[in-house]
Amino acid sequence: MILAAASITNPNYVPTEYQTFLLTVFIMLQHACISSMPTLWIARYNSFGSTLNMIGLFVVIIMIPASVTGTADTPKFFPSPQVWSVQNGTEWPDGIAVLMSFIAIIWTMSGYDAPFHLSEECSNAAVASPRAIVMTAGVGGLAGWALQLVVAYTVIEIPSVIGSSLGQPWASYLIQVMPQKIALAILGLTIVCAYSMGQGCMVAASRVTFAYARDGCFPASFWIKRVNKHTSTPVNAVWFNTAIGICLLCLIFGGSVAIGAIFSVGAIAAYVAFTIPIFIKTFFVGDRFRRGPWHLGKFSKPIGMMACSFIVVMMPILCFPSVRGSDLTPQLMK
């Protein structure tokens, strides 16, 4: 988004792969430094970031309808029959295409994983962690749905947004529907919020790595699991994740398909990890499971079955390329 903003202000500027790589590495190093601070400092930063994200989201939801200009040929808001129709950008049937679009939803809704990654660092975790999971999924889902409605009723040409030379659909959409200065203001707010979100992801990932290293799952677990004496946080795990992340960023030089596949692979890995304990609890442990103070009661088993069924359906779907048949080439395979 930062490079897209630069391209908007200077149409002659075209970001190169190495510029994208270096900027991303620079941001990741900043996130690593913040995530290496003491827990109290990180908590304050994340509380500020979470509040900023919620405020920013509601500001954007209000600003977009208020700023959409429209033209003589296009209305400010499109009619519901057009909004609620399926615009299939793949060569698969509409049903499959809709399921393939869930990749964005999966990543958006996966924010609920942070509370259980950080449960060891909060008081009254048996209640605080599940409450945070429910609030994250509920508030994020409803607010995200509201934003999607705003976008759906105002976007002019979806193919132009996706295929824009900016390489950033959100930036392309904003430029398409509103004046440039307002679009840049909203894009800037989004960048700040995304920066805060990225730091939260770094913290959550480092705690997962620390937990696995503590159980001896990695070859270098003896080093990764060390807790810094000054900050009382798993600093080594933070920088181990940072090194792995920088290595993965090298896929940028392999093209958009190569780096884009990370999102599908990451979604598959994350949701398989989430589903394994749900599957074991639902189909093997059953009534022997000892419930905590926060539970789903009689709805636990049917919800667990639905969760497992959803993952079974989505795993192969997330591996599908957007084209098939003679149009499918090795370069387009994930």
Where in this protein do the model-derived segments appear?
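C-terminal membrane-solvent junction of multi-pass transporters and transport-like membrane proteins
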Residues: 19, 48, 222-232, 274-333
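Lipid-exposed faces of alpha-helical membrane segments in multi-pass integral membrane proteins
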Residues: 22-33, 48, 52-62, 139-146, ...
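TM-loop-TM module centered on a large, flexible mid-protein loop between adjacent transmembrane helices
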Residues: 4-8, 83-85, 132, 138-199, ...
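Juxtamembrane interfacial secondary-structure elements that flank transmembrane helices
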Residues: 1-10, 62-79, 146-165, 203-220, ...
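Transmembrane helix-loop junctions in multi-pass membrane proteins
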Residues: 34-39, 182, 244-261, 286-287, ...
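Membrane-interface loop-to-helix entry segments
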Residues: 21-79, 110, 133-137, 263-274, ...
